[in-house]
Amino acid sequence: MRPLIIGIAGGTGSGKTTLVENLKEQFGADISVLPNDNYYAAHHDMSLEERQTLNYDHPAAFDTDRMIQDLEDLKAGKTVQCPVYDYAIHDRTEATLTLAPNKVILVEGILIFENKALRDLMDIKIFVDTDADVRILRRILRDVKERGRTLESVMEQYLTTVKPMHEQFVEPSKRYADVIVPEGGKNLVALMMIVQRIAYHIEHGDVVDEQ
């Protein structure tokens, strides 16, 4: 069975991860997740202070070529070794994450629709669309609680890079989406539609015809 590859994009704090977690809870072992954040480029030659000043919301921040190769390998039925990114040190670690091919692969991240070669590997493209005020509040809570950031650093990053990069790259990529989901995982109607499509694929092995 060729995997069903679903891209889930949207701005920071939009609810992408909540949607992914809801789908994983629904289908368990039949779903694997390939997060865009794992593919932040390595900067071992920089100090922590230098890495903290980088723009992590620009397409150049990601090792997209490696992500494309890993997704192609998964699509071909091969197991891949995904990089692992550590938010505390703002760098890729030496560890890798083993990801085996699966019936469904969820590709999740803010910029996964920006690159044509990457989005062309996806059978279904979903954009999670959430109000900017809600997104920034969620980002503050996440980065302070889960990633050890200060409120001041989160706000500075949002104003200097996150917001302008969202307007330049993330929001325009919405036009490539097959489905736009307001409020992410909290949109139960959209969630059930996606669940039904995945369930059909798992049962019948049917995927969208290749272009």
Language-model segments: which ranges?
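P-loop (Walker A) phosphate-binding loop of NTP-binding proteins
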Residues: 11
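Post-Walker A helix-loop "phosphate-sensing" segment adjacent to the P-loop in P-loop NTPases
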Residues: 25-34
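Conserved nucleotide-sensing/catalytic segment adjacent to the nucleotide-binding pocket
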Residues: 32-33, 45-89
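Conserved lysine of the Walker
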Residues: 16
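Hydrophobic positions on the alpha1 helix immediately C-terminal to the Walker A/P-loop
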Residues: 19
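ATP-dependent NMP and nucleoside kinases share a basic, alpha-helical "lid"
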Residues: 93-147
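Phosphate-binding/switch loop-helix module in NTP-utilizing enzymes
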Residues: 70-105, 199, 205-206
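NTP-dependent small-molecule kinase module
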Residues: 100-101, 141, 163-211
